Amino acid sequence: MAKKSMIAKAARAPKFKVRGYTRCQICGRPHSVYKDFGICRVCLRKMANEGLIPGLKKASW
């Protein structure tokens, strides 16, 4: 889990636009966040395996 202070800092508008970054809405992870879902790869995989995201399933070939 991310620190509460870092999550609050990311929520504020940055002084310069290029300094903005995305965080996972569930765990607050700053890296590997999918913009389509708004969550990180770890949470996306967990939710997909539990069937919480409609239309998304684990690939097998």
Curated annotation (Swiss-Prot):
Q: Mind listing the UniProt keywords for this protein, alphabetically?
A: Metal-binding, Ribonucleoprotein, Ribosomal protein, RNA-binding, rRNA-binding, Zinc
One Pfam family name is Ribosomal_S14
- What are the TM regions of this chain, as residue ranges? none
What is a single cellular component term in the Gene Ontology annotation? small ribosomal subunit
Per the database entry, which stretches of residues form a coiled coil?
Answer: none
* InterPro entries hit by this protein: Ribosomal_uS14 (IPR001209), Ribosomal_uS14_bact (IPR023053), Ribosomal_uS14_CS (IPR018271), Ribosomal_uS14_sf (IPR043140)
What terms describe the molecular function in GO for this protein?
Answer: rRNA binding; structural constituent of ribosome; zinc ion binding
The source's domain of life comes to: Bacteria
Annotated positions binding Zn(2+): C24, C27, C40, C43
Which cofactors does this gene product need? Answer: Zn(2+)
Co-factor note (free text):
Binds 1 zinc ion per subunit.
The biological processes this protein is annotated with in GO are: translation
Keyword Transferase annotated: no
SUPFAM superfamilies in the cross-refs: Glucocorticoid receptor-like (DNA-binding domain)
Mind telling me which PANTHER family this protein's record contains?
30S RIBOSOMAL PROTEIN S14, SMALL RIBOSOMAL SUBUNIT PROTEIN US14M
Subunit info? Part of the 30S ribosomal subunit. Contacts proteins S3 and S10.
What is the role of the protein in this entry?
Binds 16S rRNA, required for the assembly of 30S particles and may also be responsible for determining the conformation of the 16S rRNA at the A site.
Write out the similarity annotation: Belongs to the universal ribosomal protein uS14 family. Zinc-binding uS14 subfamily.
Q: What is this protein called?
A: Small ribosomal subunit protein uS14
The gene it comes from is rpsZ
